[in-house]
């Protein structure tokens, strides 16, 4: 019993330290790098010179930019043209806010252009990390390849994923996930952030503790994946963990 108690105490200490490190990372100047790129470089260059550089695309009227990430050959980021920190922002559950996940799905074409040939939809994934699972304080959705093992697991669970948020059998990458099936028409009309906030008990009050991902299934539906921070299991809710920025799935 003493050993079990000591182990539990050690886990708590590790969790607290991990949380502290995450907070420290987000309070430095480097955590504003993406915001500065968007607001001080991409947006002004588009407005003054009709050139989105260093972004790949700038859509001021639609409220977003697309930027090639330095990590990985095909990874892109979709970000707002105004200040939104992350999943904790109440703006994401405001119906007037752009449907950033749907916009990010449209932006997957940049992966194909960079690759030189079409990247199959089954190889693409979208992910946004929780407040403690991210390193940047400007909202950004990762557009990248899915890990082959995650792809296989989702394929095997196709019949187990319903139109309600339910635990995904076995979780992903050692962490618990909720999964929800959505059709394309649903996705066009309603943001995944609103689905999570309105359909999962108490999620609205704790949106910043969630990471969210989206993947297309073989039946042309989409699966939304949500994981909530749990420091006791060392889960920082970094939904980006389902992605493989080196794109092994294309080899």
UniProtKB/Swiss-Prot annotation:
Organism superkingdom: Bacteria
Pathway: Phospholipid metabolism; CDP-diacylglycerol degradation; phosphatidate from CDP-diacylglycerol: step 1/1
Coiled-coil segments on the chain, per record: none
Entry keyword Isomerase: no
Transmembrane portions of the chain: 4-24
Cell inner membrane in keyword set: yes
Name of the protein in question: CDP-diacylglycerol pyrophosphatase
